[in-house]
């Protein structure tokens, strides 16, 4: 890849990106560099579910990771970015069941083994789709190390962790209330339950006291669970019911006697202050039942139909039973009233059905000891660093209030629980391997929650439980995890405590938290709103580099991003600007050698010194911002340097030399252009891998790919404050004259007189020394630079730092319009002065900010005040002339 090729005349992202990824793969550029002296840097990709195509959130998440990986690779680190996918138990099984249902087939028709074969076929199909999407995004993943959560090695790790926790008493089997999906017929974790507002009602029911002395009124939204009531609860301090505690009521319709109990769980100010307690169908009621030793009566089957404990309602669907029970309560005089209301109801994320709280025998992880260990680790120098820091509070709050984790799922797709039951004795055996006399045992049919295996992802993918595995020793703990704030508890926290428990190390040094991708109106993207965006369609239109630029340059850690086609247009335009500027530079390089060395100071003119100083500052800023994960600010820094400094100013200034006759100056300018372009492409490469590779291959270079070229470094000798000061003054002057021309509709072809009234003496030397330079860019009829100049009566005026610019345009000047413009400028300057005054009056700023920063703000205020006086004076002159 060392010979350069000619760039096409137009930027076409499809042409640029097509085939490039395969070139990288063929060259094995995504693998670690295998240099034992290089410092390792590793990231494991958050494994996407094999349920379908990736969305914009995945594109954002993986682009941030790829930026880090590509930069570290260029900085000489031994880099590993490990890819993989998650089997996504219930999500994938639900998809396959839905597909089979279209053919009129259920999983039960196929049986467990054949159904799992169907799921593997699904996995292979969608894994191929995900691979294709990763390639189109340009992700530099080491596919030789790709993992899947059901791989043999990862399955070994899962069994070892389960057995170890079980032997420590941290995994147990018990009867508890869990979230239940009656369609999928499985337990759900909290994250698999989506809450939405449904229309419902409060049904007020009279429960008669058994002794005939009266009744007690309760209100419920779930009359279908009434057959499972085993008590009425009131608050111990509620005087209304004090004399009723200890008595009993007769359960309406069921004719069963249940006690009235006192429990602090009851809110005496809510509703009637009396609650029906159904321990088998509500988690809070379950806890109340435990405290009072109440029986647990389950009145529903797995499919949410009523069972024999529901009496005459046996066999009815739960919602049919609700109607029937309400009708019977009304007919028998127990129904007092019905108050319609809207309330939040949990629904299965995968099947959409209303979730039931169900009493079930499940496997659980005892969370308190593990959570305490994770919290204690956050007080050490081996803590996991959250970016932004505020998300550590989120993590801490969740860990301090954690409940035991139900890990069993009534599914077929997943890691089957390594527990067996003896067919004759019922004895339970838990182990990494099946019992030797397996014919006498039956394995637990449940599988583990998907989060159980993904909690082991950072170390199981590296070869653990073999702690001598080369990758585990070299690349674990990993350096950075990139993920969304919505799964801090469900995934991030579990990786932390499992890693600490089994490796005694944190799983990663930093967690970079990003937000959600929203539409232009700020709404979350969803199927129901129909506002989802397919990243592949965006790439087809704009290219991957433009999408990557949009996703990163507009992002701030922890904040959401709004997708916008207008911003995508801007991203494409920026790349097109880079393309055209690069093409101009390359077309003018001729036999210029590869820019492998920093340009020599003796060969630099003022513009060269300035652009190299600006480049040097950009390198320092972007490197620092990347280290702090401030990709949005890094993007803005790059944009300003490339668009403004390099393209709009330096290249335009370079043309004056390139089109001249001084061959030595031309050669020096060509080399400097090549050097700045080369360094700029390297800075851009982590975020725009395709177009930077294409341009780099088209210019003189050494090495096979920009991906393995060294990342730009700061060179102290390139810092040139004097050149920066001079060029900033010249640019301000040229820009001010151009603005005057634009406002007066005076094109460059029309010569104009220009007077520069110097107020800051050092400017005199700068402008005088560079008068020829100024004239080339402002095209004056005459140019006068002096102190004490008087503004012509009718002239356009521009105020720059240290000088006033007058352009006599009597025949073109609209006096009223100029007065209005200067009044606006006066208002703007007044706002800047007040802002600076407010900042300097803030002791928090003056006491804490570096003295250099405070002094810069004082200088700004003084400059604004001087400009204000100049504008005010000029305004008075024009008003007098009117």
Swiss-Prot record:
NCBIfam families: PRK05729.1 (NF004349), valS (TIGR00422). Catalyzes the attachment of valine to tRNA(Val). As ValRS can inadvertently accommodate and process structurally similar amino acids such as threonine, to avoid such errors, it has a 'posttransfer' editing activity that hydrolyzes mischarged Thr-tRNA(Val) in a tRNA-dependent manner. A motif ('KMSKS' region) lies at residues 524-528. One of its GO terms (molecular function) is ATP binding. Keywords: Aminoacyl-tRNA synthetase, ATP-binding, Coiled coil, Cytoplasm, Ligase, Nucleotide-binding, Protein biosynthesis. Its EC number is 6.1.1.9. It comes from Latilactobacillus sakei subsp. sakei (strain 23K). One of its GO terms (cellular component) is cytosol. Residues 809-882 form a coiled coil. ATP binds at residue 527. Monomer. The keyword Coiled coil applies. The lineage of its organism: Bacteria, Bacillati, Bacillota, Bacilli, Lactobacillales. It catalyses: tRNA(Val) + L-valine + ATP = L-valyl-tRNA(Val) + AMP + diphosphate. Residues 844-866 are annotated as: Disordered. GO terms for biological process: valyl-tRNA aminoacylation. It is found in: Cytoplasm. This is Valine--tRNA ligase. Gene3D superfamilies: HUPs, Isoleucyl-tRNA Synthetase, Domain 1, Valyl-tRNA synthetase, C-terminal domain, Valyl/Leucyl/Isoleucyl-tRNA synthetase, editing domain. InterPro entries: aa-tRNA-synth_I_CS, aa-tRNA-synth_Ia, Anticodon_Ia_Val, M/V/L/I-tRNA-synth_anticd-bd, Rossmann-like_a/b/a_fold, tRNA-bd_arm, tRNAsynth_Ia_anticodon-bd, Val-tRNA_synth_C_sf. It is an enzyme of class 6 (ligase).
């Amino acid at each position: 890849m060392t010979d350069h090729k000619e760039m096409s005349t137009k930027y076409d992202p499809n042409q640029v990106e097509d085939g490039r990824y395969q070139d990288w793969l063929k060259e094995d550029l995504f693998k670690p560099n295998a240099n034992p002296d290089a410092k390792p840097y590793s990231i494991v990709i958050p494994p996407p579910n094999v349920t379908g195509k990736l969305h914009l959130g995945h594109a954002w998440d993986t682009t941030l990771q790829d930026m880090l990986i590509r930069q570290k690779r260029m900085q000489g680190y031994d880099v590993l970015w490990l890819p993989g996918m998650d089997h996504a138990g219930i999500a994938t099984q639900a998809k396959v069941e839905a597909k089979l249902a279209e053919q009129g087939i259920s999983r039960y028709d196929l049986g467990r083994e054949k159904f799992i074969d169907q799921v593997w076929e699904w996995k292979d199909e969608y894994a191929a789709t995900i691979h294709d999407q990763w390639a189109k995004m340009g992700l530099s993943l080491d596919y030789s190390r790709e993992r899947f959560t059901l791989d043999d090695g990862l399955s070994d790790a899962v069994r070892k962790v389960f057995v170890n926790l079980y032997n420590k008493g941290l995994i147990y089997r018990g009867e508890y209330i869990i979230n239940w999906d009656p369609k999928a017929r499985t337990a759900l974790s909290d994250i698999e339950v989506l809450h939405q507002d449904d229309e419902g009602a409060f049904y007020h029911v009279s429960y008669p006291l058994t002794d005939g002395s009266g009744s007690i009124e309760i209100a419920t939204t779930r009359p279908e669970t009434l057959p499972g009531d085993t008590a009425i609860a009131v608050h111990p301090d509620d005087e209304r019911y004090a004399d009723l505690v200890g008595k009993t009521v007769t359960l309406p319709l069921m004719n069963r006697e249940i006690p009235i109990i006192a429990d602090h769980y009851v809110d005496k100010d809510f509703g009637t202050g009396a609650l029906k307690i159904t321990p088998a169908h509500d988690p809070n009621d379950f806890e109340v039942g435990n405290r009072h030793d109440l029986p647990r009566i389950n009145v529903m089957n797995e499919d949410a139909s009523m069972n024999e404990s529901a009496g005459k309602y046996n066999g009815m669907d739960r919602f049919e039973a609700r109607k029937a029970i309400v009708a019977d309560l009304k007919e028998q005089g127990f129904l007092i009233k019905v108050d319609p209301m809207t309330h939040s109801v949990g629904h299965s994320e995968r099947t959409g059905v209303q979730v039931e709280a169900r009493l079930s025998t499940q496997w659980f992880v005892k969370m308190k000891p593990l959570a305490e260990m994770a919290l204690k680790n956050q007080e050490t120098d081996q803590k996991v660093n959250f970016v932004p820091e505020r998300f550590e509070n989120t993590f801490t709050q969740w860990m301090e209030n954690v409940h035991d984790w139900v890990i069993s799922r009534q599914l077929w797709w997943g890691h089957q629980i390594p527990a067996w039951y003896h067919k004759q004795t019922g004895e339970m055996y838990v182990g990494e391997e099946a019992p030797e006399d397996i014919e006498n045992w039956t394995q637990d049919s449940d599988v583990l929650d998907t989060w159980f295996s993904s909690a082991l992802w950072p170390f199981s993918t590296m070869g653990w439980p073999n702690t001598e595995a080369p990758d585990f020793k070299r690349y674990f703990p990993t350096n950075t995890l990139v993920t969304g704030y919505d799964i801090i508890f469900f995934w991030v926290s579990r990786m932390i405590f499992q890693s600490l428990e089994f490796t005694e190390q944190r799983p990663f040094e930093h967690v970079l938290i990003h937000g959600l991708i929203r539409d232009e109106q700020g709404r979350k993207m969803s199927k129901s709103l129909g506002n989802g965006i397919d990243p592949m369609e965006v790439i087809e239109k704009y290219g991957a580099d433009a999408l990557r630029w949009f996703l990163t340059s507009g992002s701030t850690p922890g904040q959401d991003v709004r997708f916008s086609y207008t911003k995508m247009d801007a991203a494409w335009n920026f790349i097109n600007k880079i393309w055209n500027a690069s093409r101009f530079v390359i077309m003018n390089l001729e036999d210029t050698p590869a820019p492998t060395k920093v340009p020599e100071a003796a060969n630099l003119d003022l513009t060269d010194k300035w652009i190299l100083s600006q480049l040097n500052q950009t390198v320092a800023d972007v490197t620092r911002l990347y280290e702090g994960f401030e990709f949005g600010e890094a993007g803005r820094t790059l944009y300003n340097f490339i668009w403004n400094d390099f393209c709009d100013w330096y290249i335009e200034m370079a043309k004056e030399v390139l089109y001249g006759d001084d061959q030595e100056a031309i050669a020096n300018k060509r080399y400097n252009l090549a050097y700045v372009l080369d360094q700029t492409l390297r800075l851009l490469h982590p975020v725009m891998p395709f177009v930077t590779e294409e341009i780099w291959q088209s210019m003189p270079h050494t090495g096979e790919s920009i991906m393995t070229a060294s990342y730009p470094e700061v060179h102290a000798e390139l810092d040139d404050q004097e050149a920066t000061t001079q060029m900033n003054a010249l640019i301000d002057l040229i820009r001010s004259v151009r603005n005057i021309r634009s406002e007066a509709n005076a094109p460059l072809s029309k010569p104009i007189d220009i007077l520069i009234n110097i107020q800051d003496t050092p400017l005199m030397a700068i402008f005088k020394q560079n008068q020829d330079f100024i004239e080339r860019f402002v095209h004056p009829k005459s140019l006068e630079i002096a102190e004490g100049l008087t503004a012509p009566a009718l002239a356009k005026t521009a105020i720059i730092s240290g000088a006033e610019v007058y352009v006599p345009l009597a025949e073109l000047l609209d006096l009223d319009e100029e007065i209005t413009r200067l009044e606006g400028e006066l208002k703007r300057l007044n706002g800047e002065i007040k802002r600076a005054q407010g900042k300097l009056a803030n002791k928090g700023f003056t006491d804490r900010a570096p003295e250099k920063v405070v002094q810069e703000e004082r200088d700004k205020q003084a400059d604004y005040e001087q400009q204000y006086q100049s504008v005010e004076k000029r305004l008075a002159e024009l008003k007098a002339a009117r």
